[in-house]
């Protein structure tokens, strides 16, 4: 089916008090797995391609980006294709030109005034192309090696940021941390509720790989909508591949270990989509 507007997907999820799964793609196999999972449980899904993943693929957006768009268009469930954590404005433009229908401009590393000004410029050209924009206010832990209570978003500042920039979705710092390989993060659900009450757009949780299942359900109940997942899938995929290669040194065909790794990603994405839907 045609790409589905992420704003529509997020609004429907928020109205139903369920989470919207957004999963990062590092290899094409991940995208296949994510779409298959979404189709198996009849849930919408967001395929995310980050600036870091693009750098891994030689800095070329088009080859993998076009593949994601093709998978989305052939899917039998709603799919959006999203540029994740883009610090480069030109990369945001390139994604829009290629056909992505959502981008995340990450100016959280910039001085506050510059972040707001640049984010507003990205919103202007994206909205002209009917492309949604996500932004981040308050650095989520992990990007600078931190994971402490000081990494928090102020609700009123968040509301003002949305007013100043016009973004469609807002990623907030509420206790999660990027790139966690264990699931022990404790989210501030009271803060999530306060931000939800103050902000007129859907909220996004980055760093959800470090959050246990019960914490995710509580966060969604408190008002979190778009749930980003990356490291958690990498851990599962790599674990399967490692076990196969350690168990049989004669294996040389990548399909013999990449395939099972892909299937593990598929099964975990399906499980998470059901969890976020509170099934």
Task: State what each model feature region is.
Residues 58:
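Cofactor-binding active-site loop characterized by glycine-rich and histidine/acidic residues
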Residues 24, 148, 227, 231, ...:
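Hydrophobic alpha-helical scaffolding
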Residues 25, 81-87, 201-213:
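Glycine-rich beta-to-alpha transition loops that act as phosphate-gripper elements at the mouths
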Residues 244-279:
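Extended, intrinsically disordered, low-complexity segments
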Residues 22, 82, 134-136, 204, ...:
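Generic enzyme active-site microenvironment
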Residues 6-12, 16, 28-53, 61-76, ...:
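Alpha/beta enzyme core
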Residues 2-4, 22-28:
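N-terminal basic/disordered segments at the start of proteins
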């Amino acid at each position: 089916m045609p790409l589905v507007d992420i704003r529509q997907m997020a609004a429907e999820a928020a109205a139903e008090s369920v989470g919207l799964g957004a999963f990062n793609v590092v290899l094409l196999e991940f995208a296949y797995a994510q779409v298959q999972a979404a189709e198996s449980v009849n849930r919408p899904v967001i395929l995310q391609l980050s600036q870091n993943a693009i750098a891994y693929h030689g800095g070329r957006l088009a080859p993998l980006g076009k593949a994601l768009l093709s998978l989305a268009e052939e899917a039998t469930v709603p799919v959006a294709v999203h540029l994740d954590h883009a610090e480069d404005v030109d990369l945001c433009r390139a994604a829009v030109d290629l056909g992505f229908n959502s981008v995340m401009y990450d100016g959280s590393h910039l001085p506050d005034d510059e972040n707001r000004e640049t984010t507003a410029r990205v919103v202007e050209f994206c909205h002209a192309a009917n492309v949604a924009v996500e932004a981040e206010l308050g650095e989520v832990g992990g990007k600078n090696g931190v994971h402490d209570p000081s990494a928090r978003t102020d609700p009123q500042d968040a509301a003002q940021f949305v007013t100043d920039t016009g973004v469609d979705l807002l990623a907030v710092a509420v206790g999660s941390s990027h790139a966690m390989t264990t699931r022990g993060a404790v989210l501030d659900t009271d803060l999530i509720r306060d931000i939800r009450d103050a902000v007129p757009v859907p909220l996004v949780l980055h760093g959800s790989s470090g959050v246990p299942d019960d914490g995710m359900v509580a966060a969604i109940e408190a008002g979190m909508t778009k749930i980003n997942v990356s490291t958690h899938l990498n851990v599962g995929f790599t674990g399967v591949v490692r076990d196969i290669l350690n168990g049989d040194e004669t294996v040389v065909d990548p399909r013999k270990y990449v395939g099972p790794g892909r299937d593990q990603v598929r099964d975990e994405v399906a499980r998470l989509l059901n969890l976020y839907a509170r099934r």
